[in-house]
């Protein structure tokens, strides 16, 4: 597999009245195309800060971040926004679906913003996540697990290179969480999307190809997940 991204000695420090907080302290990661990386750690470990740096929502204090052979822009909001728009998809703990749009319209809107008005892809994505029959319903009319599956379809509608998930099953029960994660795995494999998924839930490791454990802003371990 070709290398998608590489981070070297990434640091993210914050100044507070109590002193400097080291949210990330010397992070070294490289991720290849097609990997599904589970980024595991307790609350306050630095995993969400790392996710924000991966997406260029935040800029590291120091270190190097190369994506597809080019240094990722930092500190210039226009360049960072352009990088996110071209490369990154997101799935969050809260579904953030537009409640006054139908399920299909939620996905079609993202496609249109990306310059693709072909509604057939939106319908194909709903088929992929098992929700074609719900396409004309509104988000409030379907279950939380179904809403998260719509969020997954929406996040890959523009064909992102890298999909980032932040505690995406945090509001779901165990059975629903398993169904959502299986949908995510199948979608990433079919669309050839690389994923980094932040969680504190050990049970989600089996849905990755690799697990990176982080605590106190440092990587504690980095291992392949056995099939």
Mark where each language-model region is:
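ABC-family P-loop ATPase nucleotide-binding domain
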Residues: 1-13, 220-227
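ABC family nucleotide-binding domain
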Residues: 4-211
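H-loop (His-switch) and adjacent beta-strand-loop-beta switch element
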Residues: 211-223
């Amino acid at each position: 597999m070709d290398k998608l991204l590489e981070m070297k000695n990434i640091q993210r420090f914050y100044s507070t009245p109590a002193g400097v907080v080291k949210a990330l302290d010397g992070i070294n990661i490289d991720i290849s195309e097609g990997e599904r990386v589970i980024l595991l750690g307790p609350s306050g470990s630095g995993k969400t800060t790392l996710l924000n740096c991966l997406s260029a929502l935040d800029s590291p204090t120091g270190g190097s971040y190369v994506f597809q052979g080019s240094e990722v822009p930092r500190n210039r909001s226009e360049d960072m926004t352009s990088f996110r728009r071209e490369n990154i998809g997101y799935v969050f703990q809260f579904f953030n679906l537009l409640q006054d749009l139908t399920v299909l319209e939620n996905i079609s809107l993202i496609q249109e913003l990306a310059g693709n008005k072909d509604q057939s892809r939106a319908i194909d994505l709903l088929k992929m996540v098992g929700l074609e029959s719900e396409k004309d319903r509104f988000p409030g009319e379907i279950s939380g697990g179904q809403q998260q599956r719509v969020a997954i379809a929406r996040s890959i509608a523009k064909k992102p290179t890298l999909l980032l998930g932040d505690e995406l099953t945090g509001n779901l029960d165990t059975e629903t969480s398993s169904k959502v994660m299986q949908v995510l795995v199948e979608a990433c494999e079919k669309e050839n999307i690389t994923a980094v998924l932040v969680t504190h839930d050990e049970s989600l490791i089996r849905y990755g190809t690799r697990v990176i454990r982080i605590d106190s802003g440092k990587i504690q371990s980095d291992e392949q997940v056995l099939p």
